[in-house]
């Protein structure tokens, strides 16, 4: 849909409006009594969420490519049907195709003080060229003083669908050097910065002193980002996710400014590798992330 059609079907005066940037990407601008947010139609990609009276919770690189067909650096990319590189020997875009395809906005309504949005993605020319047909994705966002993200995968095929998925959230922090993450203390992890070695559980909060890319399998734990310099805690709860990934590149990237990496941290809601999902024909699987902000008063 173009902006006129989106506005006609889904616009809510003072709450939900649609805009186009020079590259042609369209985004939804959300204002509720308790938060503001931005979601691009490409990738159903949330790039901003800010509860009233708080600093932004979601990080977006100022160097990010906001171009059709290119991934956005920051926000909440949706990885599907694989996480990171494809594993079956065939080529495909990093983190799959879902984040670089236009989704369809199917529902928008204000329920109390929260805005409910639903996006869908059906098979596309790109997905079929990569061997993926007969699936359905439904992505629900509940935007208010807290944020709920719910990704449902449906299998319309007559054979099982094996897939990986992630809500690859970039959180905004004041200084990653002063951030700790709790919740993963009892969990061993795969260290992608050290030749995929399996490392034992640290039994201590996670601190950041260099390039970090850790895959924590077999965990459903709630994580808390303690942003000391920002005097707040970001609570990340998840459902039907058995993998958590923690990432910071510790350097500039082509689409990440030289002084930006210390302002971000990814804590990702994932099902990947040994926790990949095998979905029977006619069945659906829903993974959820719920985030909230708590002020640090000490």
Residue ranges and their predicted role:
Residues 158-162, 166-242:
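Active-site/ligand-binding surface loops and adjacent short beta/alpha elements
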Residues 67-68, 107, 138-140, 275-279:
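Beta-strand-rich interaction surfaces with strong enrichment in secreted/lumenal proteins
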Residues 1-33, 42, 124-128, 213-298:
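Beta-strand-rich recognition/accessory modules
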Residues 17-18, 92-143:
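Extended, loop-rich substrate-binding clefts of extracytoplasmic carbohydrate-active enzymes
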Residues 70-96, 182-188, 195, 204, ...:
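Beta-strand/loop-rich accessory regions of lumenal/periplasmic or secreted enzymes
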Residues 39, 151-157, 293:
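Asparagine-centered strand-capping/turn motif at beta-strand->loop junctions
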Residues 33-91:
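Acidic-aromatic substrate-binding/catalytic surfaces of carbohydrate-active enzymes
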Residues 137, 147-149, 285:
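Hydrophobic core residues within well-ordered beta-strands of beta-rich domains
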